[in-house]
Amino acid sequence: MPGLIDCHCHVLQSTSNLAALSVESANYAAARAFEIMRGMLSRGFTTIRDVGGADFGIAKAVEEGLVEGPRVIYGGKALTATGGHGDYRSKGQYYEDPSYHVPRISRLCDGVDALRLAVRDEVRKGAHHIKIMANGG
């Protein structure tokens, strides 16, 4: 019997409290993601398309059989502008480095050059697609 495909998920987003996720260890977040993925597989999902957060490490762990889970098609970090849908910083958080990464699922990139660089970087890291979070959502 063919498996199901989840076309929009964020396996690193183990809670809707994104502020709490931003202070978690990346290793802990990955462990939680693997737990989520085992559950997805047990519900019949054999492929998932992660649209922000998962990367080559998550996909490789499944491919090599290190963890049990569905095949992962990933977009790496979702791209967002300052104040966009993927800018999860609190009002008191600032940054000066234009390559600043918003924790876990998105990445800030303001302007054409920064967006071009971010796309190229995510593709370099193996992203199968690119998600752009252009405005509030």
Regions flagged by a language model, labelled:
Residues 66-137:
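Metal-coordinating catalytic core of metallo-dependent amide/deamination hydrolases
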Residues 1-64, 82-89:
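Metal-associated gating/positioning segment near the N- to mid-region
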